[in-house]
Design a protein with these regions (language model features):
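Start-of-helix signal in alpha-solenoid helical-repeat scaffolds, especially tetratricopeptide repeats
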Residues: 305, 309, 323-330, 342, ...
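Extended alpha-helical scaffolding segments used for macromolecular assembly and cargo binding
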Residues: 22, 36-40, 261-263, 283-286, ...
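Alpha-helical sensor/transducer elements of the RecA-like P-loop NTPase core
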Residues: 107, 114-175, 182, 189-192, ...
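Helix-coil-helix junctions within alpha-helical repeat/solenoid scaffolds
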Residues: 19, 397, 405-409, 503, ...
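Internal alpha-solenoid helical repeat scaffolds
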Residues: 77, 102, 140-141, 171-173, ...
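N-terminal pre-P-loop "Q-motif" helix
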Residues: 1-14, 80, 803
């Protein structure tokens, strides 16, 4: 039961207080009136009697109370009510619950009103909104005898809670949006939607997250409930609903033309449709989306084809003003009794892919291929397929064409999609390079060649050839009137290269060039250049700018746009982790990985898993971090070599979470060296700063040099942090913590504050020690309960050397001396020597007592 605390308390107070003698709950069918009313009466306790109004009992005087009153033959209403009242009150104080009080007969309603007026019983009743109600029932709340409580549908958060309680697991945010919109927050509808989707197999659990893929299913029980309302509608209104089923929303003029103005007005008056303004035009929508599913079930195949044909004929005579208009027309043509030309399906496929609705784009592209479309249709089909994980079919579709038979425009289009599929979906960098080289050798037109040069930049950056990526991108950006796809490929390849090089300002300029042409680019591809922009902003320390950029592409609501939704979650999770908002980051990234479970999105799962590993490590969840790193490593290769230094940083954080500080520092330093060799100076700075946060004092000089190369204030603060750490400068570390917090890098701030506390302790300054420790604790809490090496050391100051502390932590984690020696690459005798000295300093007699002390337990 999803609690409605405010309403529940209002009912309980009314049933026990000195004011009204109860409450009446009003609301639409299925919003949870009865459930809440019964829960409230059960909580109050005592003698509770429930009755329910029905259509069949409405014609029987005192029909709902008949089973309580017993057999009575009097025909005088006054005598009849007196006997009923006596029977109801015979057992003392009573709470009378009346479900569907709007269906009470007049005598029952009058009896209920008299009991309320006389305060002879406590009453709780439910009434459906929008229906005729007996006057006596209305008087219950109008005259103040009962408290009226209007029960609204569930909010989206309440709807998610309800569905998750039914499923026993986490619900995907994208699915939550779809279900909430389909149900309108109606608890009854939600329950049936979940049951119907489970039965149909469209609601399934992936990586622990429940996802809805495809149309929302309707159970037979819910269909029957809704059909009762549908069957009561006159024929003209039904015609309106039937047309709307296949074309929602539809222009009001078109609907009036097809169904008649009077029918449309009647449908609106009955509350089954609504007329709303959309882009300065009036359109017709269902008042409740599930009506469309019920109407769809009632129609046969022939009727549905005929209705689609009527709609297609009407809309094809009107101008196409948007991609949505074209997509709607193509959808109607697909399964209608009318025919449409190849050009419509190709254009609609491009529109759908541009809007990131890949399943729909695939349908249109297949229709174009079936109508003997050439390489253009095949290219559209492959673009839709590769992102959905059908990489083999995409390759087979494109490989069936002989490049020698294609003109240069076709070659560029065919080659770009095939290279994309081979590199990012299939992970075959060698084959991708071969195809790209083949196509480039056959193209001579400068503008077409620019597209392939831009593509070469994108390939180079993924293969960690940073300088090549930048050079190719610069060539495109300096080409006058370069085609949109050329500019976009260059904005991604060059933009990511610049971000990694630490040239954040130039990367943002590249990103803007990409934004200028993004209307020409496939919907999901836009995330590639946006990801580069988000990284550039976080590397420079512009966290608010990164947040704005990451949330710019969040308006995805169609069922087929789940991959775009997942990509947007990666962007948001990336910013969350950079800011230290780890619980939010973990939720966003885990949901993204579940949504992007298809092989077509494999390239984007790599960086997502790295961010996830960092988040888990920061919270001390080493097992989860190790799992994320293993998942990333499985998908590694030359096609994702650009992320190798960041993978090593994630491994360093994992080692830190496991308490092995020496290996953690070594891994971080190796990551810095690898990044330096690749000219990834922003990543080099990140790796060096990671080592400093683990306690490495030797990185100040390198970070100072990088501060002169890398844009933004973040690296400046990192450099000052490293200098203060090496000098055991407590005030300097406090200042670094303040600067990190101002920037929005909360975990860096927490680590700097924790190291400041240790420095103040070393200097014997207890006041500042306490202040810095309090700051570190506050920031760690803001990060979701962070547990880093610096924070752990500040929270538990011990008279141990760094190596002794490291080995003691591993003992506390349950490792044997041999396992510790293997992990730290030292001898067992060395481990034993450090343990011996640690036990003496901690005044314990053996390793078990030392382990207990480190875990905060009482030594045995």
């Amino acid at each position: 039961m999803i609690e409605r605390a405010t309403e529940f308390e209002a009912i309980r107070s009314a049933l026990t207080g000195d004011g009204p003698v109860g409450a009446v709950l009003t609301g639409d069918a299925g919003v949870g009136k009865t459930t809440l009313a019964r829960q409230a009466t059960a909580a109050v306790g005592g003698n509770v009697r429930w009755v329910a109004g029905t259509e069949s009992a409405r014609s029987i005087p005192l029909g709902v109370f008949a089973h309580m009153v017993g057999v009575y033959t009097a025909h005088d209403p006054v005598t009849f009510m007196s006997a009923a009242r006596e029977a109801l009150l015979a057992d003392g104080p009573i709470i009378i619950g009346v479900d569907d009080a709007h269906l009470l007969d007049q005598l029952s309603a009058t009896l209920l009103l008299q009991l309320a007026i006389d305060r002879a019983a406590r009453i709780v009743a439910t009434v459906r909104s929008g229906v005729q109600v007996p006057d006596a029932v209305t008087s219950l709340w109008k005259d103040g005898h009962l408290l009226r409580i209007d029960l609204n549908p569930f909010s989206q958060r309440q709807s998610v809670d309800l569905v998750e309680s039914m499923l026993g697991g986490q619900l995907e945010g994208f699915t939550a949006n779809l279900m909430w919109e389909s149900s309108g927050g109606n608890a009854l509808f939600l329950r049936h939607l979940v049951e119907g989707a489970l039965e149909a197999g469209s609601l399934r659990q992936v990586n622990g997250v429940w996802q809805l893929r495809g149309r929302a299913a309707v159970t037979s029980e819910l269909a029957a409930l809704l059909e009762d309302r549908v069957e009561q509608l006159p024929e003209p209104v039904l015609r309106v609903l039937e047309l709307l089923t296949f074309c929602e929303p539809i222009d009001l003029e078109v609907m009036a033309e097809l169904a008649g103005e009077e029918a449309v007005e009647a449908a609106e008056n009955r509350g089954v449709i609504r007329v709303v303004e959309n882009s300065h035009e009036l359109v017709v929508r269902y008042n409740h989306p599930l009506f469309g599913e019920v109407i769809r079930r009632r129609l046969g195949i022939a009727s549905a084809r005929r209705l689609r044909g009527r709609l297609y004929s009407a809309l094809s005579e009107r101008p196409i003003n948007s991609a949505a208009d074209r997509i709607r027309l193509a959808e109607l043509a697909l399964d209608s009794d009318k025919s449409a030309d190849l050009e419509l399906f190709e254009a609609a496929a491009a529109d759908a892919i541009g809007l990131a609705n890949l399943p729909l784009g695939e349908r249109f592209a297949r229709a174009a291929v079936e109508r003997r479309g050439g390489v253009e249709s095949a290219d559209l089909l492959a673009r839709a397929l590769l992102w959905q994980g059908h990489r083999i079919e995409a390759e087979r579709t494109l490989a069936s064409f002989d490049p020698d038979q294609l003109n240069e425009v076709q070659l560029a289009r065919w080659g770009s999609t095939r290279v994309s599929n081979l590199l990012w979906a299939m992970g075959d960098a060698d084959r991708a390079d071969e195809v790209l080289a083949l196509v480039r050798s056959k193209v001579s037109h400068p503008k077409i060649a620019a597209i392939l040069t831009g593509l070469a930049s994108a390939c180079a950056v993924n293969e960690n050839r940073i300088d090549d990526a930048f050079d190719d991108a610069e060539s495109v950006m300096n080409t006058e009137d370069a085609p949109p796809w050329a500019v976009w490929w260059a904005s991604f390849g060059g933009g990511l290269a610049l971000a990694l090089m630490g040239r954040g300002e130039a990367a943002r300029q590249y990103a803007q060039r990409g934004h200028d042409v993004e209307s020409h680019i496939d919907g999901l591809n836009r995330f590639m250049s946006t990801h580069a922009e988000v990284l550039a902003l976080t590397f420079t320390g512009d966290m608010e700018g990164a947040r704005r950029c990451a949330t710019a592409y969040f308006g995805y609501s169609a069922p087929g746009q789940y991959l775009a939704w997942g990509m947007s979650k990666i962007l948001q999770g990336t910013v969350d982790v950079a800011q230290g908002r780890f619980p939010d980051g973990i939720e966003h990234l885990e949901q993204a990985l579940a949504a992007l479970s298809t092989e077509g999105a494999a390239a984007w799962m790599f960086p997502a898993r790295l961010r996830l590993a960092e988040a888990y490590s920061a919270l001390g969840r080493a097992g989860d971090a190790a799992e994320a790193i293993a998942g990333a490593t499985e998908r590694g290769g030359r096609h994702s070599a650009v992320y190798e230094p960041q993978l090593e940083i994630a491994k360093a954080w994992l080692a830190g979470a496991e308490g092995t500080i020496t290996p953690a520092i070594r891994i971080a330093m190796n990551a810095a060296d690898a990044a330096a060799r690749a000219h990834q100076h922003a990543i080099e700075a990140m790796a060096l700063h990671t080592a400093a946060r683990f306690g490495e004092h030797s990185v100040a000089g390198r970070l100072a040099d990088l501060a002169a190369k890398v844009d933004g204030e973040l690296v400046q603060v990192q450099a000052r942090h490293a200098v203060a750490l090496a000098a055991h400068d407590g005030p300097g570390l406090d200042a670094a913590a303040t600067e990190f917090e101002r920037i929005g890098a909360l975990l860096s701030a927490a680590d700097a504050a924790a190291q400041a506390a240790s420095a103040h302790e070393r200097a014997g300054d207890r006041r500042r020690l306490l202040e810095s420790a309090a700051t570190a604790n506050r920031l760690a809490a803001a990060c979701g309960g962070a547990s880093t090496p610096a924070l752990r050391q500040a929270a538990q100051p011990l008279p141990l050397t760094a190596r002794e502390r490291e080995i003691a932590n591993l003992v506390a984690a349950g490792l044997t001396n041999r396992q510790i020696a293997d992990r730290l690459t030292v001898s067992v005798r060395t481990v034993e020597g450090h343990l011996y000295r640690a036990c003496i300093k901690m005044d314990v007699t053996d390793r078990e007592s030392l382990a207990a002390l480190l875990r905060g337990e009482t030594p045995p």
